[in-house]
Amino acid sequence: PAKKVCRKAAGSALLADIDQISRIVAAVASAVDVPVSVKTRIGLTLDDNAGTQAAVAAQEAGAQLIVMHGRSRACRFKGHACPERLHQARSRLRVPLLANGDIVDLASAEHALRRSGADGVMLGRGAMGQPWIFAKLLGHSLPSAEDRLDLIREHLDAMHAFYGEEAGVRIARKHMQAYLQRWGTPELIADFMALSNAQQQHAWLFARRQQMLQRAAYVFTQGKVAA
């Protein structure tokens, strides 16, 4: 629903042009050798069923999986997702349907499945700052604070390597902010956001390791921030 995307007749703006969705999905499906998936919202507004129309059109054009976010385009990122609005799409689809929106832990995943009748869930922003949530959803034990810091360092390395230093440093700020918010450390967020190159970011993370471990011991045991 981002304005810069919708201005280009892309993203959720396509819900106003179901025929164009069909053409795009058909073109992609005929051009690749892997299954094609489509993600949509429930509609342009809460009063229409454009999401269901888009899902069915995408299926008929060759999509093998549909993901539906429980908000309308008009809702943008406000309010709450409405997983129950996925039932109509589920009843008309032959391919799997995944529920998306406001899924941040096991309880919200179970809620989305129960209310939507979907075949599964897809996490988006709920995984920001806690990539280990997938292990938790599968019933596995969570990594220790030390292991989480190692994962954060690996993620930082990967962003610099994949995007290059200029873009990697910029993108790392967003992800590190998500990590640090979950650890309840606003002062550390401000410090990290001021760093201007990859070397500074690496050095900062190394220098703050012990401080972050001490903070984690409090945050995770007191339940102040979602683990």
Residue spans of the language-model regions?
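Active-site beta-loop-alpha junctions enriched in small/polar residues
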Residues: 1, 39-45, 71-73, 100-104, ...
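Active-site beta->alpha loop and helix N-cap motifs at the rims of alpha/beta catalytic domains
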Residues: 1-36, 41-49, 59
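Glycine-rich tight-turn/loop motif centered on a GG-T
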Residues: 3-21, 71-83, 141-143
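Alpha/beta catalytic cores of nucleotide-metabolism and tRNA/nucleoside-modifying enzymes
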Residues: 23-26, 31-33, 47-65, 77, ...
